[in-house]
């Protein structure tokens, strides 16, 4: 990689914000499973009351078209189709009176449902 390309690559912001809270919870869950090869896969699929819904799963396999992000020793994977809906989003983990859950704050969503797991663009 040329010096210019390397400089540009280091200056470009990450397409997704993966918070310390989310990475910490994923790390905790991976340690509980006892499988250090597990990575958090975030995806978008059709469905939900607003047209699209978010999904989270653990995966050991990294596909060629996956965008990979690492934070605090944890790997986040997003497939190419889902990435177009998630660019600029923040993936967080919240614990409050309503419970504990992974949350996506998506600036691309024009409508969201009350539970926050469904959206439209």
Swiss-Prot record:
Recorded protein name is: Putative iron-sulfur cluster insertion protein ErpA
What gene makes this protein? erpA
Question: Taxonomically, what lineage is the organism?
Answer: Bacteria, Pseudomonadati, Pseudomonadota, Betaproteobacteria, Burkholderiales
Note accompanying the cofactor annotation: Binds 1 iron-sulfur cluster per subunit.
UniProtKB keywords: Iron, Iron-sulfur, Metal-binding
Positions with a binding annotation for iron-sulfur cluster: 49, 113, 115
Q: Entry's SUPFAM superfamilies?
A: HesB-like domain
Q: Which InterPro entries match?
A: FeS_biogenesis, FeS_cluster_insertion, FeS_cluster_insertion_CS, FeS_cluster_insertion_RrpA, HesB-like_dom_sf
Pfam families given in the database record: Fe-S_biosyn
Which GO BP terms sit in this record? Answer: iron-sulfur cluster assembly
Give the function comment from the record. Required for insertion of 4Fe-4S clusters.
Q: Which GO terms describe its molecular function?
A: 2 iron, 2 sulfur cluster binding; 4 iron, 4 sulfur cluster binding; iron ion binding
What cofactors are annotated for this protein? iron-sulfur cluster
């Amino acid at each position: 990689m040329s010096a210019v390309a390397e400089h540009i690559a280091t200056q470009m912001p990450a397409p997704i914000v993966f918070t310390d809270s989310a990475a910490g919870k994923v790390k905790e869950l991976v340690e509980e499973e006892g499988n250090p090869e597990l990575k958090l896969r975030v995806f978008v699929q059709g469905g939900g009351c607003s047209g699209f819904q978010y999904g989270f799963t653990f995966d050991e396999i990294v596909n060629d078209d996956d965008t990979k992000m690492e934070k605090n020793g944890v790997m986040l994977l997003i497939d190419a189709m889902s990435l177009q809906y998630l660019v600029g989003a923040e993936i967080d983990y919240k614990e409050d009176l309503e419970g504990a859950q992974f949350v996506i704050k998506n600036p691309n969503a024009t409508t969201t449902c009350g539970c926050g797991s469904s959206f439209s663009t």
